[in-house]
């Protein structure tokens, strides 16, 4: 399974505990300090390891990138050329910062629409994680039937009445009004935190997240200066 690194530990545990092997394609920082996908590396890793499934995190956890349309289009073209199905985790899609906008993976092309299973939830944005209210959007009937068959193995893998109405309530106008205020507060917090870290901690850099409420710090210079190995 192709996975970008750094990665969310939940992906690692779920994939490995189900008997699959992870192949990482590292994200790299460009001259402006922005985390980017290495499309050539993705293509090479997929071919070398005969990979046919990839996990795509958008917005990215923990780097906080809200991928631009051209980036998603290019990634999906790599997956298309290699006949690679895509599991797109878009749980952070509502929680973008500043003027950044989330682009649904399935929206960039007809092929992306058909080879992608996209997963969403109000849990991160609206503090509803304990209510078990995630959902998927799958246009390809074959993929939808396969996932439905697997998820039916346990009757616990379903929404309950409380979680269903919590989801509906979160996606009402009042919920989005609250979300607008939350995004404004989080954007200010991120600006303050990143500026403070850069100005007070030598050797530690911080790429400002464009979404999520995660901060992913680069401490490599500090570690090298203090003889600490990574």
PLM-predicted stretches and their roles:
Residues 2-230:
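PLP-dependent class I/II
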């Amino acid at each position: 399974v192709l996975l970008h690194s750094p990665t969310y530990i939940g992906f690692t545990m779920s994939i490995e505990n189900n008997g699959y092997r992870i192949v990482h394609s590292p994200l790299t920082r460009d001259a402006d300090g922005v985390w980017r996908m290495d499309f050539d590396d993705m293509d090479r890793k997929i071919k070398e390891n005969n990979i046919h499934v990839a996990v795509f995190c958008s917005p990215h956890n923990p780097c906080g990138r809200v991928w631009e349309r051209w980036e998603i289009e290019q990634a999906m073209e790599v997956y298309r050329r290699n006949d690679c199905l895509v599991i797109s985790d878009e749980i952070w899609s509502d929680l973008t910062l500043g003027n950044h906008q989330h682009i649904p993976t399935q929206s960039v092309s007809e092929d992306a629409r058909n080879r992608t299973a996209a997963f969403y939830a109000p849990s991160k944005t609206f503090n509803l994680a304990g209510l078990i209210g995630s959902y998927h959007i799958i246009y390809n009937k074959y993929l939808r039937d396969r996932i439905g068959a697997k998820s039916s193995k346990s009757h616990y893998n379903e929404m309950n009445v409380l979680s269903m109405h919590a989801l509906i309530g979160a996606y009402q106008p009042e919920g989005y009004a609250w979300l607008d205020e939350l995004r404004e507060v989080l954007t200010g917090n991120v600006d303050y935190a990143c500026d403070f870290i850069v100005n007070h901690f030598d050797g530690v850099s911080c790429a400002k997240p464009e979404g999520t409420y995660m901060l992913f710090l680069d401490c490599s210079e500090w570690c090298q200066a203090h003889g600490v190995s990574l």
